[in-house]
Regions:
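Short, solvent-exposed turn/loop segments enriched in Gly/Ser/Thr/Pro and often Arg
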Residues: 191-199, 248-258, 275-276
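Acidic, His- and aromatic-enriched active-site or binding-groove loops in soluble protein domains
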Residues: 210-220, 267-284, 293
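Glycine-rich phosphate-binding "P-loop"
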Residues: 160-165, 213-229
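An active-site-proximal "capping" alpha-helix that borders the catalytic cofactor pocket
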Residues: 231-242
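Conserved beta-strand positions
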Residues: 215, 252, 339-341
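Conserved residues at the C-terminal ends of beta-strands
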Residues: 253, 273-275, 304, 342
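Terminal accessory/targeting
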Residues: 1-190, 195-198, 243-244, 263-266, ...
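Metal-dependent catalytic neighborhoods of phosphoester/phosphodiester hydrolases
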Residues: 201-202, 225-232, 261-263
């Protein structure tokens, strides 16, 4: 398949300011320890076509991981940028209200980068869809079977996540969980494991109701990814406390990250990365509204809705219109709607009604798969292990448990219909 034609098409069609697709000289080397993030594995096409698409498959993985692993960002020695280290050095001495005011002024004074675009970045979606169009042309086919992205043929996926920043957020957790239960949802609560006293009896009460808990690092002090020395010293305690409290998922405090180091942590899934978030201390994003693999074990579940704190406290915007524009954009493309809210902020009376309104509207999404992060990670592993075989009697699935697996035509996928533009910015 001639990928150069697709690259030319992508360059010609891209809006001004967007990052160009990766060129061969900057593509990351393939890591054989990573379960494949190539286009063939993404679409899960019939195995009989793999050989004919061989070189295009390899190329697609390199291109995809250029986005997924943020290879478009300037390389560094591994140390945090100086401004992040300086911020965390003075953070304890600045009152919270003043700190948020200063961050809000700084964020609103800066222009939003054109890539990754916010709140919607379509570069990777374009790569997936254009690769498939090229594959169809190479194979002389007008349509192909594939393993559907979500269980039971669901149209999209819906995941609720929270980061519990402090004791106030912990106090508000049960009331916020009540609101979610009212609409038939369950969520995950990520807790810093060495920052403040945690009422583990309350945690177990909420867990018994079907909610999950994850590790939100040790402290909000910027230390975990500050340097390799810090990471090497802190990671064992983080993993030990997470095991003690039966936490198999992770999100880094303030979404600070070094992807190479992150991949060494002993968790089943991570949700540190966004698809696009220019407002975090470490801006960027994976450009993905679907899960992907960090290595053989760990699945990345990028958060795909803007954070409540970002919209309400920093940008001073009504979150609901931005949330719903992004929800509609993701749902129309069959992706994963993954929220990131904080009971510390959204759990108060002034904001909880807006969160309830979000849940009410999410409840109206037709044929969406409501799942906990652990369920999505398990599903993505299961789907990756399966193979699609075409025989005289039609397509069939082999290689593992096919329960809840639905085989569909790629032409039926929302991603293959319509444009990728987003109405809210």
């Amino acid at each position: 398949m001639a990928t150069s034609a697709n690259e030319m098409k992508r360059n010609d069609a891209r809006e001004p300011g967007h990052a160009p697709p990766p060129s061969p000289g900057v593509l990351p080397a393939l890591d054989t320890d990573v379960l494949s993030n190539d286009a063939f594995a993404f679409w899960k096409l019939p195995e009989k076509w793999r050989e004919a698409l061989g070189s295009a498959i390899v190329r697609s993985r390199k291109e995809a991981e250029w986005y997924l692993f943020e290879s478009y960002r300037p390389s560094s020695s591994g140390r945090q940028p100086r401004k992040i280290r300086a911020y965390y050095a003075i953070k304890p001495f600045i009152p919270t209200a003043l700190r948020q005011r200063m961050r809000s002024l700084a964020v609103r004074a800066c222009s939003v980068p054109s890539f990754p675009a916010w709140p919607c970045e379509s570069a990777l979606l374009e790569l997936w869809s254009e690769w498939l169009e090229g594959a169809l042309a190479t194979l002389g086919q007008s349509d192909l079977w594939h393993i559907g992205f979500w269980p039971d043929g669901r149209n999209c996926c819906l995941v609720l996540t929270h980061d519990v920043e402090g004791p106030l957020g912990l106090e508000r957790m049960e009331a916020m969980a009540d609101v979610e239960e009212k609409f038939g949802f369950r969520s995950v609560w990520n807790i810093p494991l060495d920052q403040y006293p945690v009422d583990w009896h309350m945690v177990e009460r909420v867990r018994a109701r079907g909610f999950e808990f994850g590790a939100h690092g040790l402290r909000h002090d910027g230390c975990l990814f500050r340097s390799l020395k810090d990471f090497t010293e802190l990671a064992p305690r983080l993993e030990s406390l997470a095991r003690e409290h039966q936490m198999r998922g992770f999100r880094s405090p303030s979404t600070l990250r070094n992807i190479d180091w992150l991949c060494t942590l002993n968790f089943d899934f991570d949700s540190t990365m966004a698809d696009s978030d220019p407002f975090e201390p470490q801006p960027g994003g994976s450009c993905s509204i679907f899960p992907f693999f960090l290595n053989q074990r760990m699945v990345e579940l990028p958060y795909t809705l803007p954070q409540d704190h970002t919209l309400t406290n920093l940008l001073r915007r009504d979150p609901l219109p931005v949330w719903m524009a992004k929800v509609e954009w993701i749902a129309k493309r069959g992706g994963m709607i993954l929220t990131l809210t904080h009971p510390d902020y959204t759990g108060d009376a002034a904001n909880l009604h807006k969160y309830a309104e979000l849940l009410k509207r999410l409840n109206d999404l037709e044929f969406a798969w409501r799942a906990l992060p652990s369920e999505v990670a398990a599903w993505w592993h299961k789907r990756a292990a399966l193979q699609l075989v075409e025989g005289r009697d039609g397509p069939s699935v082999s290689g593992g448990d096919a329960d809840r697996v639905v085989v569909k035509r790629v032409s039926a996928e929302p991603m293959m219909r319509g444009k990728f533009s987003c109405s809210e910015s």
